[in-house]
């Protein structure tokens, strides 16, 4: 064949076998930006059904990490696949910019004590720098989106709209001021939301402490026995927060639980009977049960406060007492526990903070005032021991909430804060803050009271609590994976009132004026908030910092403005009010968003915050579906940690292997679970990528001289195997569309790899090679094959483009011959071939027969009967119904099986016999053909090759032509 090689249709392509992705990809990033590809996608999609993907904004601080990459690439895959499916797919990226981490960073760089205006200016500058830095990293991953209009929560308009949105919630009666225990970080010097907590192992000092009985006679009567005066009697509590002992205000018991009175060497001790054996075993003391009483019989008993000798505390019924650990008697400190506070509020029992905002004991506490927590705990324990009320002290390891930023344990302490109430009933329907003027304010005990009156919202539904509204709002929302629904429901059911106020400088202010005497809101709050919002929209949050109440007609002697800022989760959780509903961006269309997509930790984070703000303002969720992805772990299943040295940089992967390798790993990994990554795993991804790239290269080579406008063959002139290939292409497209639509990207990668390796590489392309290489270059047989390949290639590229974005675009540029064109401007509906069930049915018999043929050929090679399959003639024996199906395809079977000939015979079962062909071999195409005869050159050529050479010679004589393969 060597002397005929130049006469074959062996075409070239500028699409190389080696991807060299780290070098090629950055140029495509620049091209997409310069050519405004996303904007052109939106323009091309005008009038199509909208699909809105709302971005949960990452925090604008530091380099992006592998979790960011997973999140953003998944969103990009969704966006591009929805466009390919015929939607006007929209994604506006953004950043979360306010909050403690940035303010803390500015304090590190510039020191504390700066005036608020300076802090806000420096924070804004720093946040902007961080967003630009992260933007570059995100773009490097191939993300398309509305980057020119990316949002930042610190944008003036966004800040202003957040104020307006908060006022809508207040107008529905859900915002109130209360004195409640909140999560408090001594380093942040601020309250924290549940979503700002991380749970880590902590070893605490746990104590069993006795609360002495004040009246032995009353005590004895409750156990129906005579008083015992020779020993002190104590109810024993167990706590892992001994620092709260000075704040003890009551002891809680379970009403129906049995409590035993036990005689021990040093005292009479009362604990829940089911827990007594374990307790006394840990103490190692002898004990004897003297009497029993139900918890309800102990209610009202007076006990001595364990820290303050002259103070009494009562025994109360507490429904949250359990009998699975401890003593069955709970130490209640209403200033330092949510359940304690609520119970004591109902009972009229006041509580006092024993720790200040810096984590030191209150200055007025005897013996421990002003001490750091650890020192004070030691003195409390020593005092209890000296008083004879310390029953046991031990180290206790448990999961404890820590500040997500400082990694330090938080405190629970009562502070005046602003809350969105989860269980306050309000009318359903969108509130009109211009007509309504209602709020809630809570007194020192946390009880909410009305301070205004709400006018009914138009078309208001029945009153519901925010908790109930949130539950109803997600009832019909699909979750991916479905198990994520339970997490969201658990978040709703267990969520306390949302503390939305913070004591920081860099944040959106609570835009209210309160009376100096009773802290009630100004009666004109609705109009005042709009006036403040107008100023913030012009000048940012600095406008509030420098605003004097008198400028808005507020009596400064009677009112003062709040100094609190809003929780950053309220910032990001309310961003839907600006990004997709703001009149300035009315072109986005579609609210609620079609999809929210974030990590598994966002059920109590952004998912939860968005759900609560949407329901609080409008009574509905701001999303139609939720997709949750898992965290990234290393190859051994360990979480990423700098201390373990197992972190993986997405930038490094992009710079060494290519962003498409990272994208393919993300798509081929089940996001519903933890996502493992390592060099070994990435190497396997590279192998998958190479297979698909080689398939693309083969396809591009073999359509290099094909122009569908001039060369396409009508469907009626296609060979049946080409029609079958197009039918299988349509099945592949439909399967990909379905998998993308249900966000099953693992299925897409399997489909694409299987299509390249098995359907194309393992069947159709093998069957085509002879026709492509040896047939007349512009003959119908070859053009028919190219017609099918052109469609296959277009649909394959559109199908893999959401995942292998760089590679698909590189290939499309070669395929289209136009750098201005982009694969992302095309849809399946434009290119997918029509379904052809008849072709699929015909060729199902061929595909079923193929394994029998392959096995027979392998056995013939093993017996040295043949070398190449082209030297074989087959006798296919099969039942009549199979032969009837194969008969119309008989003329194509030899090419499909790559043999010299096929004979069909009837038999009861399928069997394939192989014989060596006696036919001569063509020296050009290497087929064994009856038409092989001597050529003028002296070589033996088949009739097809003689015709091809003759056509080629005439063409060369008639006019000079470019080398075969040029466009």
Curated annotation (Swiss-Prot):
Binding site for Zn(2+): 922, 925, 942, 945
Quaternary data: Monomer.
InterPro entries associated with the record: aa-tRNA-synth_I_CS, aa-tRNA-synth_Ia, Anticodon_Ile_BEm, Ile-tRNA-ligase, Ile-tRNA-ligase_type1, Ile-tRNA_ligase, M/V/L/I-tRNA-synth_anticd-bd, Rossmann-like_a/b/a_fold
Domain notes: IleRS has two distinct active sites: one for aminoacylation and one for editing. The misactivated valine is translocated from the active site to the editing site, which sterically excludes the correctly activated isoleucine. The single editing site contains two valyl binding pockets, one specific for each substrate (Val-AMP or Val-tRNA(Ile)).
Spans traversing the lipid bilayer: none
Keywords in alphabetical order: Aminoacyl-tRNA synthetase, ATP-binding, Cytoplasm, Ligase, Metal-binding, Nucleotide-binding, Protein biosynthesis, Zinc
GO MF terms, alphabetically ordered: aminoacyl-tRNA deacylase activity; ATP binding; isoleucine-tRNA ligase activity; tRNA binding; zinc ion binding
Catalysed reactions, semicolon-separated: tRNA(Ile) + L-isoleucine + ATP = L-isoleucyl-tRNA(Ile) + AMP + diphosphate
Residues that bind L-isoleucyl-5'-AMP: 598
Binding site for ATP: 642
Cofactor: Zn(2+)
GO process terms (BP): isoleucyl-tRNA aminoacylation
Protein's UniProt name: Isoleucine--tRNA ligase 2
Record note on cofactor: Binds 1 zinc ion per subunit.
PROSITE patterns membership: AA_TRNA_LIGASE_I
EC numbers on record: 6.1.1.5
Low complexity bias spans: 437-446
Pfam families documented for this protein: Anticodon_1 (PF08264), tRNA-synt_1 (PF00133), zf-FPG_IleRS (PF06827)
Family listed: Belongs to the class-I aminoacyl-tRNA synthetase family. IleS type 1 subfamily.
């Amino acid at each position: 064949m060597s002397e005929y090689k130049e006469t074959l249709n062996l075409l070239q392509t500028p699409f190389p076998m080696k991807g060299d992705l780290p070098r090629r990809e950055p140029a495509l990033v620049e091209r997409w930006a310069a050519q405004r590809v996303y904007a052109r996608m939106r323009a091309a999609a005008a009038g199509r059904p909208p699909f809105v993907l709302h971005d949960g904004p990452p925090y604008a601080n530091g380099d992006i990490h592998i979790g960011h990459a997973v999140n953003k690439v998944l969103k990009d895959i969704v966006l591009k696949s929805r466009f390919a499916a015929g939607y006007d797919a929209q994604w506006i990226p953004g950043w979360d910019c306010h909050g403690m981490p940035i303010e803390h960073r500015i304090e590190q760089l510039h020191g504390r004590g700066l005036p608020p205006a300076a802090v806000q200016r420096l924070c804004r500058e720093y946040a902007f720098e961080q967003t630009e830095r992260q933007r570059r990293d995100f773009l490097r991953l191939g993300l398309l989106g509305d980057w020119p209009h990316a949002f930042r929560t610190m944008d003036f308009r966004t800040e202003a709209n957040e104020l307006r949105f908060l006022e809508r919630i207040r107008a529905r009666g859900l915002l109130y001021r209360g004195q409640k225990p909140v999560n408090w970080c001594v380093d942040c010097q601020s309250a924290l939301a549940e979503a700002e907590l991380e749970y880590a192992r902590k070893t605490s000092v746990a104590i069993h402490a006795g609360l002495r009985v004040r009246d032995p006679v009353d005590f004895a009567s409750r156990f129906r026995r005579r008083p015992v005066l020779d020993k002190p009697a104590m109810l024993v509590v167990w706590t892992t927060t001994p620092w709260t002992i000075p704040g003890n205000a009551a002891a809680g018991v379970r009403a129906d639980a049995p409590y035993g009175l036990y005689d021990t060497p040093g005292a009479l001790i009362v604990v829940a009977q089911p827990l007594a054996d374990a307790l006394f075993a840990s103490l190692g003391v002898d004990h004897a049960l003297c009497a029993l009483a139900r918890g309800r019989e102990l209610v009202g008993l007076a006990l001595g406060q364990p820290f303050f000798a002259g103070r009494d505390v009562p025994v109360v019924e507490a429904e949250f007492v359990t009998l699975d650990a401890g003593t069955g008697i709970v130490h209640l400190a209403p200033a330092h526990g949510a359940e304690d506070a609520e119970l004591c509020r109902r009972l009229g029992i006041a509580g006092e903070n024993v720790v200040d905002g810096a984590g030191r004991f209150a200055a007025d506490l005897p013996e421990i005032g002003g001490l750091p927590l650890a020192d004070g705990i030691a003195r409390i324990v020593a005092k209890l021991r000296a008083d004879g009320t310390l029953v046991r002290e031990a180290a206790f390891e448990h999961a404890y909430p820590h500040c997500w930023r400082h990694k330090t344990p938080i405190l629970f302490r009562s502070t005046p804060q602003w809350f969105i109430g989860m269980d306050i009933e309000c009318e359903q329907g969108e509130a009109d803050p211009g007509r309504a003027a209602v709020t809630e304010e809570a007194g020192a005990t946390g009880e909410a009271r009305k301070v205004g009156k709400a006018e009914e919202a138009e078309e208001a539904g029945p009153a519901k609590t925010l908790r109930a509204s949130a539950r109803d709002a997600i009832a019909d929302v699909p979750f991916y994976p479905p198990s994520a629904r339970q997490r969201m429901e658990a978040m709703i059911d267990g969520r306390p009132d949302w503390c939305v106020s913070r004591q920081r400088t860099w944040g959106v202010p609570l835009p209210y004026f309160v009376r100096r005497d009773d802290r009630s809101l100004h009666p004109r709050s609705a109009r005042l908030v709009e006036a403040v919002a107008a100023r913030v929209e012009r000048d940012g949050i600095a406008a509030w910092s420098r605003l004097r109440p008198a400028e808005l007609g507020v009596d400064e002697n009677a009112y003062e403005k709040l100094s609190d800022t809003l929780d950053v989760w309220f910032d990001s959780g309310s961003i839907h009010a600006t990004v997709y509903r703001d009149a300035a961006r009315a072109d986005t269309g579609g609210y609620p968003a079609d999809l929210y997509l974030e990590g598994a930790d966002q059920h109590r984070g952004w998912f939860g915050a968005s759900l609560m703000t949407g329901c609080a303002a409008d009574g509905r969720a701001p999303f139609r579906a939720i997709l949750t992805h898992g965290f990234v772990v290393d190859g051994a299943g360990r979480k990423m940690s700098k201390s373990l040295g197992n972190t993986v940089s997405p930038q490094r992967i992009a710079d060494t292997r290519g962003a498409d390798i990272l994208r393919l790993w993300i798509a081929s990994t089940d996001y519903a679970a933890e996502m493992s990554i390592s060099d070994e795993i990435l190497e396997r991804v590279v192998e998958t990528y190479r297979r698909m790239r080689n398939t693309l290269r083969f396809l591009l080579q073999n359509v290099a001289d094909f122009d569908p406008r001039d060369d396409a063959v009508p469907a009626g002139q296609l060979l049946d195997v080409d029609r079958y290939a197009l039918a299988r292409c349509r099945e592949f497209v439909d399967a990909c569309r379905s998998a993308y639509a249900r966000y099953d990207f693992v299925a897409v990668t399997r489909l694409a790899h299987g299509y390249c390796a098995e359907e194309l590489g393992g069947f159709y392309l093998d069957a085509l090679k002879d026709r492509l290489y040896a047939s007349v270059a512009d003959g119908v047989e070859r053009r028919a094959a190219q017609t099918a390949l052109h469609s296959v290639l277009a649909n394959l590229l559109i199908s893999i483009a959401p995942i292998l974005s760089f590679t698909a675009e590189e290939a499309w540029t070669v395929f289209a011959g136009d750098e201005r064109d982009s694969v992302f401007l095309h849809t399946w509906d434009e290119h997918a071939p029509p379904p052809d069930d008849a072709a699929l049915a015909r060729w199902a018999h061929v595909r079923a027969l193929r394994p029998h043929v392959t096995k027979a050929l392998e056995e013939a090679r093993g017996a040295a009967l043949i070398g190449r399959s082209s030297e074989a003639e087959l006798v296919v024996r099969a039942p009549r119904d199979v032969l009837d199906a194969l008969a119309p395809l008989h003329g194509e079977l030899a090419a499909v099986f790559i043999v010299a000939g096929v004979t069909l015979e009837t038999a009861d079962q399928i069997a394939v016999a192989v014989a060596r062909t006696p036919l001569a071999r063509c020296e050009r195409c290497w087929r064994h053909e009856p038409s092989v005869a001597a050529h003028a050159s002296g070589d033996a050529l088949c009739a097809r090759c003689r015709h091809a050479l003759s056509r080629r010679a005439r063409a060369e004589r008639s006019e000079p032509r470019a080398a075969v393969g040029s466009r």
